[in-house]
Amino acid sequence: MTGELAFIHALRAIATDPAARGLADDAAVLAVGGETLVLTMDTVVEGVHYLPDDAPADVAWKLVAVNVSDLSAKGATPLGCLYSHALGDDAWDAAFLAGLDEACRRFAIPLLGGDTVRMPPESPRSFSLTALGTGRKHCPVPSRTAARAGDRVWVSGTIGDARLGLAAARGELAGPRAHLATLAARYRRPSPEPRLGMALAPLVNAMMDVSDGLLVDAARMAQASGVGIAIGLDTVPLSAALVAVAGDTTEARMTAATAGDDYELLFTAPPEHTARIREAGGVLRLRVTAIGVVEVGEGLALSSGGRSVALPARLGYQH
């Protein structure tokens, strides 16, 4: 058994309840009485998901945000969270808790409980959070398995900022200070918007969050849905900060499309819902961009300016 995919495949023999969705989605979906509960869990590990010298408050914010992103992808309203904390330096822990409180307030997801553990000295610290949400009434909870041929492919926000933000945080990137700060903020404090997920849920056929990279997550959606997805690389939305620092070349776009930590929404919807999707984004003042189409077939295809573009060897982050 090697890698995350093989391990998850082995877990499927245990997670046979329909609520687990075959361990092929961003969250579990559990019917309880007249309510639909959405449950998700993520872990952040020092040296993997955050830098050892990242501010503790930013680490806490990211822990909450990545879970809220999963709830958003299911169109769920945040209900509460539980988390486990690896105890360490008292001052660091106090700053972490301040960031946790700030994030829980920002995303309206109250802390309900959790666990603590004392780590051996010099061990990388890790933190896990389980988020609970409620699905929209009279609306199926979106999955990544229901994209249909003829759908348009959409993404929210802008793509690739966090990767450059990580480089900026490491001092590896040159450019205008204001733009570097903007990019670093996207890495340190992603800001998923559950209200957009809620608004989109009745309109989409498939939806997931972009966490490991736009291309690899689109490929996963295509595989899960048994369809092909064609994306126009030239239509992928980039921020002004990214363009100012990295340019708007095919290479820069490919780098952005294979980066992770975006925590935007990737979704497919019938063409007749285009106006309502744009309206949902407009009401919330959030960018939504059509970047491709769902096709009969399988796999992922890329183009730019109407010409085919070869897929890169690495589509995104692999665990």
Give the label of every model feature segment:
Residues 44-53, 135, 178-183, 249:
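Glycine/charged-rich beta-loop-alpha catalytic/anionic-binding loops adjacent to active sites
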Residues 137-189:
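Phosphate/diphosphate-binding glycine-rich loops and adjacent basic-rich segments that engage nucleotide
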Residues 1-58, 74, 83, 103-104, ...:
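Extreme N-terminal cap/leader segments of soluble proteins
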Residues 17-19, 27-28, 100-101, 115-120, ...:
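A generic local secondary-structure boundary/capping motif
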Residues 1-13, 87-112, 117-127, 132, ...:
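Glycine-/charge-enriched secondary-structure boundary and capping motifs
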Residues 55-59, 183-190, 205-206, 253-255:
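Short pre-catalytic strand/loop immediately N-terminal to key active-site residues, enriched for Gly-Thr
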Residues 151-157, 189-214, 218:
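Internal active-site segments that recognize and position negatively charged phosphoryl groups
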Residues 56-82, 95-106, 195, 199, ...:
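Small-aliphatic-rich amphipathic alpha-helix that forms the alpha element of a beta-alpha
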